[in-house]
Amino acid sequence: MGKYNLILSEYLSFIYNSQSAVQIPIYYSSNSELESRCIEFHSKCLENSKNGLSLKKLFIEYNDVIENATLLSILSYSYDKYNAVERKLAKYARGKPLEADLTVNELDYENNKITSELFPTAEEYTDSLMDPAILTSLSSNLNAVMFWLEKHENDTAEKLKIYKRRLDLFTIVASTVNKYGVPRHNAKYRYEYDVMKDKPYYLVTWANSSIEMLMSVFSHEDYLIARELIVLSYSNRSTLAKLVSSPMSILVALVDINGTFITNEELELEFSNKYVRAIVPDQTFNELNQMLDNMRKAGLVDIPKMIQDWLTDCSIEKFPLMAKIYSWSFHVGFRKQKMLDAALDQLKTEYTEDVDEEMYREYTMLIRDEVVKMLEEPVKHDDHLLQDSELAGLLSMSSASNGESRQLKFGRKTIFSTKKNMHVMDDMANGRYTPGIIPPVNVDKPIPLGRRDVPGRRTRIIFILPYEYFIAQHAVVEKMLIYAKHTREYAEFYSQSNQLLSYGDVTRFLSNNAMVLYTDVSQWDSSQHNTQPFRKGIIMGLDILANMTNDTRVIQTLNLYKQTQINLMNSYVQIPDGNIIKKIQYGAVASGEKQTKAANSIANLALIKTVLSRISNKYSFVTKIIRVDGDDNYAVLQFNTEVTKQMVQDVSNDVRETYARMNAKVKALVSTVGIEIAKRYIAGGKIFFRAGINLLNNEKRGQNTQWDQAAVLYSNYIVNRLRGFETDREFILTKIMQMTSVAITGSLRLFPSERVLTTNSTFKIFDSEDFIIEYGTTDDEVYIQRAFMSLSSQRSGIADEIAASTTFKNYISKLSEQLLFSKNNIVSKGIALTEKAKLNSYAPISLEKRRAQISALLTMLQKPVTFKSSKITINDILRDIKPFFTLREAHLPIQYQKFMPTLPENVQYIIQCIGSRTYQIEDDGSKSAISRLISKYSVYKPSIEELYKVISLHENEIQLYLISLGIPKIDADTYVGSKIYSQDKYRILESYVYNLLSINYGCYQLFDFNSPDLEKLIRIPFKGKIPAVTFILHLYAKLEIINYAIKNGSWISLFCNYPKSEMIKLWKKMWNITSLRSPYTNANFFQD
């Protein structure tokens, strides 16, 4: 503890280094005597600083506070004005500023010109192409770097080298930024025209990326990669990331496999010592050399040299450097293009008639058959979800934009909003709600567009379709996904699997007579050629399905779905171009439909099957696996002879030729040892993930507050670190300090302490120890947690007003009426709460809540008031358990090989000792009998929180709950009277606790919690049958042991003698655990 607080104090004296600056620490304690000393100390500090007296004497006088109480926050004030950054920066700006080459990029605006050249007037200016979209500023980032540099200028040995490397790189950034002056941001952290007009347009986003890169430099190789990317990304804003990461798709095919992990019948990873040689035809090397040439043409020197050097022996030992280059390339920032260019990208592909009609027919038929296969069971059995598809759609309607702003009346309040949920309510109130009519998206009503930006790829457009499309597609797509869940081919959806399972699937069949074909089909998904066969395949499938049932409601659902496909075959889009809005006929498929993911997966599976059926005419092979994962598909083919160079080359050329016959511009590769797809890559029998999450630039702006973004920043840092890209932790902590500070007045700021930001409360931002989620059990920790719980949820006047309006109330009661067969307060309240929560995405409401939150927080950070909360948190449970455990040293041998080389040492060690897991632990209650029973008769999906509440009710209340949701009385009676009900109690509690303990997030998702090696370190004498208590004791012990091992790199064993008398008490408590939502949990969820 305390590293953060120490840095915070140093940071404050670095930032506010004038005579007028004062730092006042604020302490608190759960001990009432000490607490009164804390209050006394604080008021005397204020008194002294008002009178300009030193605080030193007080620090001595109140030593007991400083020693024994807990730091709550630091209050700092300074009358210093802004030019501080510029002054400090000048010291580092000793180098030659970079000059942008203004001819590198094809599109004029992607060249890093002076802003006024790209946008001659303020009216024409937009920051959308360079907006870092993050609630922290360039000046803060510069400050954070300079703080780190100043703090480390006296480092020695290896640390000194790191300092010099970073200093050298920062000199480039500082000199360039200093030449033009630091751009000042406005209150919303945006950079306006008058600030930017005389500066290079991409200066800010480039500087942010560069700072992120230079603060991730440790070794000499890091330095070389970073220097090259920093210098070149100043000019090349379009293709740099793509150029640098392209070779990876070939590199994975060059490394021999010497021992790997494969999936066994039990879906676990097991080691296999097989040896598979990489067989690489000359053609492949030629392609690789072409890529390296392209890199050199773009001015890259060191990076292609590193790759070239690695090629001499292609060893897996040195492969992590290749992985590093691949990850680093993403950190040059997002490529943000104008919407017009993004849309035209799909349209400028020449439409040729010269295609293989036969293949198209086969492709369409495969899509048709798959759609039928997915839906035939629910359709034949007149599934209630397909009958009540409209209601199901309404219940899960999102609060995203509906494409146009409308004036809406809620009671006396009139507001403007674009949100779907509000439009639905308004339409219902005014009789305009007609879900049976799917509005056209033709030339009269073109589709408004959203955007998706990603590093190293072109900007993609997203359809913002009217909500009718969502309602029409929701239920059918849900059924498709249920089918995909138990179909291994759909890697993305396969039941509770994680990426390690997919890894073991690929390596399993690799051998000297097999090859793997992997294709990136992202170009195909958005191509015009895909549109007709794709939509027609779906339509034909729906026609077949409609003949399988006589239920009018099911037929209506299928017809509406079909109508969305027909409408979208003739789609027009509207694109703002300057002041005019262009209408363009858009023949391609774009994201934005509910079906996007599911339908693309179906199409990509159909595509690879079509291709394989073609090449099977020429070769004899067995298809061992076919997988589709998002934009990528891959298949392992087993031949009856050993694979030779010539075979690989022939198959490769035939596959490409086959794709070409469908005019599919895709990147198809064949290898014998590895694959590379968007989500993961396999090389030398080991699995790698791209650590490419940008920290200081974001894709888009959302409803997030600064606190939320600080948590997201930390969460991104953790994910990158697990994947092999490490940013300096002190720098991340400094960013958290900056982003979580709260301004009281112009010169007064409050900085929360580590305890506030890491305690498991509604304000949690990060973990005090990376990878370890701590649940504080000391008096002070529980005290502060209680204090924060008292101000957790804030009211919003606007939201209350909307919720009180008849429009809103009628909508809720309409939903409840359609859903419920009899009164059910839990569900009705639940729906009302969900709908009210959706209002949060309406900016004025989230702003209002945020202001209330901040002011409550300000009070709390200056003096915590606890109110005696009767709520029990997971901390209370663990606090009760902890005293009964005794620990002693233990030893576990390393017994598994490494298969994920990028993991940090301490995490790697644990996997090598206890093994990894290839599945997600069920934490939403969906496997419980009650959840299955409800979904059998109702479209309502209770959350894990609701199930947890319901399952602990009296039996007759559970019966009423079930009956009100339309479950027949006989089924409800049977359920409550059976053993299943008591099993469910345990099962749901288990899920709920797993959910609270974030067992599927961070690095915990990698560990096998059921490992026998872990179990044997725990001894808990069995006393009486309370499975729930046994469960929590074991889980606590496992987490303690794992956390200890992460921290110390050694093992302990735990013995617990839990008194029987306490067990029943604990069991009762376990039914009242409150879940805490925080920016931290939100960021974890956001990672998903």
Swiss-Prot record:
The lineage of its organism: Viruses, Riboviria, Orthornavirae, Duplornaviricota, Resentoviricetes. Its EC number is 2.7.7.48. It comes from Rotavirus A (strain RVA/Human/Philippines/L26/1987/G12P1B[4]). One of its GO terms (molecular function) is RNA binding. Belongs to the reoviridae RNA-directed RNA polymerase family. This is RNA-directed RNA polymerase. Its cofactor is Mg(2+). Keywords: Magnesium, Nucleotide-binding, Nucleotidyltransferase, RNA-binding, RNA-directed RNA polymerase, Transferase, Viral RNA replication, Virion. The keyword tRNA processing does not apply. It is found in: Virion. It catalyses: RNA(n) + a ribonucleoside 5'-triphosphate = RNA(n+1) + diphosphate.
